[in-house]
Amino acid sequence: MSVHPTQTLSLSQYLIEEQLKLPQATGDFTALMSHLVYAAKIVSREVRKAGLLENVLGSNETVNVQGETQMKLDEYADKVFNHTLTRSGHLCILGSEEHEETVSVPSGYKIGKYTIAIDPLDGSSNIDANVSIGTIFSVHLRKSPADTPGTLSDLLQKGSGQRAAGYVLYGSSTMLVLCTGKGVSGFTLDPSCGEFILSHPDMQMPETGGIYSINEGNYNYWSDEVKNYIRDIKSIEGGKKPQSGRYIGSLVADFHRNLLKGGIFLYPNDTKSTKYPNGKLRLLYEAAPMAFIAEQAGGMAVTVYGERILDLTPKELHERTTLVVGSKKEVEHFLKFAPKKP
């Protein structure tokens, strides 16, 4: 069997090669990513054994800071990433979906120059149904003085300033999609050697797509403008080919499919509940990293009002937003229907 050259390039080798291209590089980012990837491998191992082990599936019967029922794997993934990253020596502060406040580097450990905002296990409500889930992360350089404890302001930066962003998809295989501001690369975990291998170099999102991803169960709660858009892309008037609806309910899985196949993902605000008037997705560790990846792959990401996601400066750790992300021409078509911001 012939082997393509890229299929022998590990993530570690890839990061070192990229580091060598930058004369000012210190190796800190490469080391930080090594710790993050190690944690992802541990989580992947537990996800793959979820149906075989006790105390892995199901909920903890507790509610996290987001008001969501915390799944057992949620808590496990959170502990793994927190422990690994805060003790890496390259992080100054961590923001996690599972914690109301920021997570500091423990006493006795070196404080680094990077911040990470992370959703340790996105789509966790799908765990028991064996649906693909994922980890989403965003990396920034700190703004506060070096060697001092990181602050919340170090995390609250525009998405356009991200040093890196990515996600790990725990599906039929475990895949890491990484963007460091110079394109998007995909790595698949080879269980035989325990390494992420470059499997999808220079990933590009198709300019158009025939798939839309949205929870149509909330149709009656959307604005008229969003309803009109959905009716338009489903219309067969004039011989138009309607788009196909594909909604998994896991942001990582829905986004990943559209990254490969082309399409659009929408999470608008609605009137179903007064709890999330500005949308439900978190800006720092869901919308911003996905927007960074989408734009680097040739796509677009905006709010339901047409604001570029990467231009938004978060005002709080768990700030929420609407999200429309996907193929460039599909998002541009949505903008023709976008409501005006109140």
UniProtKB/Swiss-Prot annotation:
Pathway: Carbohydrate biosynthesis; gluconeogenesis. Its main location: cytoplasm. GO terms for cellular component: cytosol. Keywords: Carbohydrate metabolism, Cytoplasm, Hydrolase, Magnesium, Metal-binding. It is an enzyme of class 3 (hydrolase). Binds 2 magnesium ions per subunit. Mg(2+) 2 binds at D119, D122, E286. Substrate binds at D122, G123, S124, S125, N215, Y247, K280. GO terms for molecular function: fructose 1,6-bisphosphate 1-phosphatase activity; magnesium ion binding. GO terms for biological process: fructose 1,6-bisphosphate metabolic process; fructose 6-phosphate metabolic process; fructose metabolic process; gluconeogenesis; sucrose biosynthetic process. The keyword Hydrolase applies. Pfam families: FBPase, FBPase_C. Its cofactor is Mg(2+). It catalyses: beta-D-fructose 1,6-bisphosphate + H2O = beta-D-fructose 6-phosphate + phosphate. Belongs to the FBPase class 1 family. Homotetramer. PANTHER family: FRUCTOSE-1,6-BISPHOSPHATASE-RELATED, SEDOHEPTULOSE-1,7-BISPHOSPHATASE, CHLOROPLASTIC. This is Fructose-1,6-bisphosphatase class 1. It comes from Leptospira borgpetersenii serovar Hardjo-bovis (strain JB197).
